[in-house]
Amino acid sequence: MAPKKKSNDRAIQAKGSEAEQLIEDYLVSQYKPFSVNDIVQNLHNKVTKTTATKALENLVNEKRIVSKTFGKIIIYSCNEQDTALPSNIDPSQFDFETVLQLRNDLIELERDKSTAKDALDSVTKEPENEDLLTIIENEENELKKIESKLQSLQDDWDPANDEIVKRIMSEDTLLQKEITKRSKICKNLIATIKDSVCPKNMNEFLEEIGFEDI
């Protein structure tokens, strides 16, 4: 049985003059401009970006291809070919700058198309006009139920309950103050016992004399 290929085996990538010839042949076959990233991607990583960049630089220096810089991006294309065009076609429509402009226009159109599609998807997610009436009606009914429940609570409320609530809150405040006061006294007492008696285990000592955890 033949040994299985390891999944992490990498395809052999072109380098040096082989990479230059591969890229030049590709640009000639496509006869349109590309960035280095496009070339690497379209060649399915047969060359690395570093190798492709060096190969393109050599090809330009040897005048085997041409390049043009747009901002931070360098676009590469094969040298202009003597292509036989139909008599009704203006050759000026196929020079480097025109093709590049058309390519940029296409990118813009694709971007506009994507934006329009996102807007359409957003609109289609909204409910239909007929459904809006039902949704509004349901929301109004829910609001009426809440208002009815609130009114019922207000009608059943006994003013005397206000005094009861206030008294409970006042007593709770006094109780919390008393708890805080007694807790402080207890802690001071424990500190005094600790300094005076100096037990080996304070927790066991407190448990023996009946103190609970504070």
Curated annotation (Swiss-Prot):
Provide the family line.
Answer: Belongs to the HOP2 family.
Q: What is this protein called?
A: Homologous-pairing protein 2
Q: Report whether Coiled coil shows up as a keyword of the record.
A: yes
From the UniProt record, give one GO term of the biological process aspect: reciprocal meiotic recombination
Question: What is the organism lineage in this UniProt record?
Answer: Eukaryota, Fungi, Dikarya, Ascomycota, Saccharomycotina
The UniProt keyword set, sorted, is: Coiled coil, DNA recombination, DNA-binding, Meiosis, Nucleus
Q: What this chain does, per the record?
A: Required for proper homologous chromosome pairing and efficient cross-over and intragenic recombination during meiosis. Stimulates DMC1-dependent homologous strand assimilation required for the resolution of meiotic double-strand breaks.
The record describes its quaternary structure and partners as: Heterodimer with MND1. MND1-HOP2 binds preferentially to dsDNA.
User: Per the database entry, which stretches of residues form a coiled coil?
Assistant: 97-160
Q: Which Gene3D superfamilies match?
A: Winged helix-like DNA-binding domain superfamily/Winged helix DNA-binding domain (1.10.10.10)
InterPro entries reported in the protein's UniProt record: Hop2_WH_dom, WH-like_DNA-bd_sf
> PANTHER family attached here?
HOMOLOGOUS-PAIRING PROTEIN 2 HOMOLOG, TBP-1 INTERACTING PROTEIN
Q: Would I find Nucleus among this entry's keywords? A: yes
- Which GO MF terms are attached to this record? double-stranded DNA binding; recombinase activator activity
Give GO cellular component annotations, separated by semicolons: condensed nuclear chromosome; DNA recombinase auxiliary factor complex
What organism is listed for this UniProt entry?
A: Saccharomyces cerevisiae (strain ATCC 204508 / S288c) (Baker's yeast)
Q: Where in the cell is it found?
A: Nucleus
